[in-house]
Swiss-Prot record:
Keyword NAD: yes
Organism: Levilactobacillus brevis (strain ATCC 367 / BCRC 12310 / CIP 105137 / JCM 1170 / LMG 11437 / NCIMB 947 / NCTC 947)
PROSITE patterns: GIDA_1 (PS01280), GIDA_2 (PS01281)
Annotated positions binding FAD: G18, A19, G20, H21, A22, G23
One Pfam family it belongs to: GIDA
Binding site for NAD(+): 281-295
This protein's record includes keyword Protein transport: no
Listed GO CC annotations: cytosol
Entry superkingdom: Bacteria
Protein name as it appears in the record: tRNA uridine 5-carboxymethylaminomethyl modification enzyme MnmG
A single MF term (Gene Ontology): flavin adenine dinucleotide binding
Function text: NAD-binding protein involved in the addition of a carboxymethylaminomethyl (cmnm) group at the wobble position (U34) of certain tRNAs, forming tRNA-cmnm(5)s(2)U34.
Stated family: Belongs to the MnmG family.
Compartments reported by the entry: Cytoplasm
Length: 636
């Protein structure tokens, strides 16, 4: 075969490899910060495509989308334009775990994001396959494509996803492929070990798609959207919300004993159990065959039938991810209530792909082996569109800052779920596809759906991703919120017959003395609208989102205060930096495991070091004393 001749392509400030959910956010962020940016993708028809579930959000993930929006990212705006159903989950639980979830029109989502990218002034979108990096003096200085183009840049982001040496598995069938039968990238990650990178092999899977015209909906349970408006973007008005007649329902059904018998009878053909699949799969999104084996005592498992869009009859069978042979998949489908006559349009499959071991990353998502190279998304070992988009935004911001010659940007665990995720990856690593859960966030009461803008919009404005106009609106909202909180902390409600009758009707003791309106609102049976029956309303009616923020701030004030005190302790630890050139071999007294882990992960602060598995408080005390004593000769 004739060798492809290389040629000099254009120079850019930032190059992003891969235009999935991570790459799209990375490229938009870098470009909006004023950098000439190139976004490379294997196929222009796969930009921000949803090869698995046609949805955005859910527990923890929905909050990440709000954080992306608060920082100036695109995912929230894009799904608000293209959803077919919206639901707020966990409404019966506390505010820390409430999460928005949207059913997406996957084709409209892709088209809208692609058009947004095409209209961005500093951003060039180009189809092509990146085979290798341009590396000089230990620094990444660009990329080389399969057509021979050498594009140089000040910073590069790799967001290759499951296309990175992807391999699809369906029963006994195996072939090289990216997601959804797209072309894979076979050389880029294969070249990374020569630059000092350690790679892992992960796998994920997807369920079969069925023809919606062949589903018996009357045998399933309807799951409609919400009547009350909700949005992912803080900029989307309530007037844009779709009423129920314009939303599409999902439908609930279940596996049964017959389904389980079919699966058990064919486990000898299941790649997951025959040793064919080598990659590690996601713990929190197991295949149906894995569920049947691991949870053998359960008589049934939930399945949600979800529309893939308005202009397609393909339906996604959520909960039925599988890599069983095609004929077995058909038998499984026909054993399920409502799917007895369902026509399978696409079989489910497993896909294996390359992952960069995340201990090789800094909190900015820059790689340790190569300066100026950043990675994001499934390349870093995560699962999920939202996790990918959050990392993409952070990597794009930092690639953009590097190109501008500015210091890096990080998010702490107390700032955002994005910060929790990145800290988990770089500090603890992951041996399986990482999924964000509310339980991973120790400060989840202050990392809520409702307050993402209060946490992050000022940072987004400082980075140049939030317009002055939007920032002014945010400051006005913040001022209104604070003014009403101050007012409620000044107004005193005095006891009278009306107020005491109300209090006693809820089984409470009558008021003896006056009580502040803020304190009265903390009572579990009092909401803001009820409070206004006993005090004057503010001069201007309040937006319902501000009312929600007021209620949460006051009702959970004690818990929030405790969380903020813990955050203050964390920040003191985060302020204790570990010198970059520290020599762990020279520190006496460290436990062997601690010594090995510290040397491998190279934490940047004592707080990060304290979160490493195998590093105990005694090791942190030794390390702290060593740094404070300023043993410069050994440190440097």
């Amino acid at each position: 075969m004739t060798e492809v001749k290389e040629y000099a392509g254009q120079d850019y400030d930032v190059i992003v490899v891969g235009a999935g959910h991570a790459g799209s956010e990375a490229a938009l962020a870098a470009a909006r910060m004023g950098n000439r940016t190139l976004l490379m993708t294997i196929n222009l028809d796969m930009v921000a495509f949803m090869p698995c579930n046609p949805s955005v959000g859910g527990p923890a993930k929905g909050i990440v989308v709000r954080e992306i929006d608060a920082l100036g990212g695109e995912m929230g705006r894009n799904i608000d334009k293209t959803y077919v159903q919206m639901r707020m989950l966990n409404t019966g639980k506390g505010p820390a775990v409430r999460a928005l979830r949207a059913q997406a029109d996957k084709h409209a989502y892709h088209a809208e994001m692609k058009h947004t990218i095409e209209r961005e002034p500093n951003l060039t979108l180009r189809q092509g396959i990146v085979d290798d990096l341009i590396v000089e003096d230990g620094e990444c200085q660009g990329v080389i494509t399969n057509t021979g183009a050498r594009y140089r840049a000040k910073a590069v982001v790799i967001a290759a996803g499951t296309a990175a040496r992807g391999k699809i598995i369906i029963g006994e069938l195996m072939y090289s492929s990216g997601p959804n039968n797209s072309q894979p990238a076979t050389k880029l990650t294969a070249n990374l070990p020569k630059y000092g990178f350690d790679l892992e092999r992960f796998k994920t899977g997807t369920p079969p798609r069925v023809d919606g015209n062949t589903i018996h909906y009357d045998e399933t349970e309807e799951q409609p959207g919400d009547v009350e408006p909700n949005h992912f973007s803080f900029t989307t008005p309530d007037s844009a919300y779709l009423d129920l007649k314009n939303q599409l329902s999902c439908w609930l059904t279940y596996t049964n004993e017959k389904t389980h018998e079919i699966i058990k009878a064919n486990l000898d053909r299941a790649p997951m159990f025959t040793g064919v699949i080598e990659g590690v799969g996601p713990r929190y999104c197991p295949s149906i065959e894995d569920k049947i084996v691991r949870f053998a005592d359960k008589p049934r498992h939930q399945l949600f039938l979800e529309p893939e869009g308005r202009k397609t009859d393909e339906w996604y069978v959520q909960g039925l991810s599988t890599s069983m042979p095609e004929e077995v998949q058909q038998k499984i489908l026909h054993s399920i209530k409502g799917l007895e006559d369902a026509q399978m349009m696409r079989p489910g499959y497993a896909i294996e792909y390359d992952v960069v071991s995340p201990y090789q990353l800094r909190p900015t998502l820059e790689t340790k082996p190569l300066k100026n190279l950043f990675t994001a998304g499934q390349t870093n070992g995560t699962s999920g569109y939202e996790e990918a988009a959050g990392q993409g935004l952070l990597a794009g911001i930092n690639a953009g800052l590097r190109a501008l010659g500015k210091p890096g940007f990080t998010l702490k665990r107390s700032d955002a779920y994005i910060g929790v995720m990145v800290d988990d990856l770089v500090t603890k690593g992951t041996k399986e596809p990482y999924r964000l859960l509310t339980s991973r966030a120790e400060y989840r009461l202050i990392l809520r759906h409702d307050n993402a803008d209060l946490r992050l919009t000022a940072k987004g404005h400082e980075l140049g991703l939030i317009s002055d106009e939007r920032y002014a609106d945010f400051l006005a909202k913040k001022a209104t919120l604070q003014a009403e909180l101050d007012r409620l902390n000044q107004i005193r409600i005095k006891p009278n017959d009306e107020i005491n009758a109300f209090v006693e009707s809820h089984g409470d003791k009558p008021l003896q003395d006056g009580v502040l309106a803020a304190a009265f609102l903390r009572r579990p049976y009092v909401d803001y609208q009820t409070l206004l029956q006993f005090i004057d309303a503010p001069e201007q009616p309040l937006d319902r989102h501000i009312i929600e923020e007021i209620e949460i701030s006051l009702k959970y004030a004690g818990y929030i205060k405790k969380a903020e005190e813990n955050v203050a302790k964390l920040k003191r630890m985060e302020a204790k930096a570990i010198p970059a050139q520290i020599d762990y071999d020279a520190i006496d007294g460290l436990a062997t495991e601690a010594h090995q882990k510290l040397k491998k992960i190279q934490p940047e602060t004592l707080a990060q070091a304290s979160r490493i598995s195998g590093v105990n408080p005694a090791d942190i005390a030794i390390l702290s004393v060593y740094i404070e004593q300023g043993k410069i000769a050994k440190v440097q």
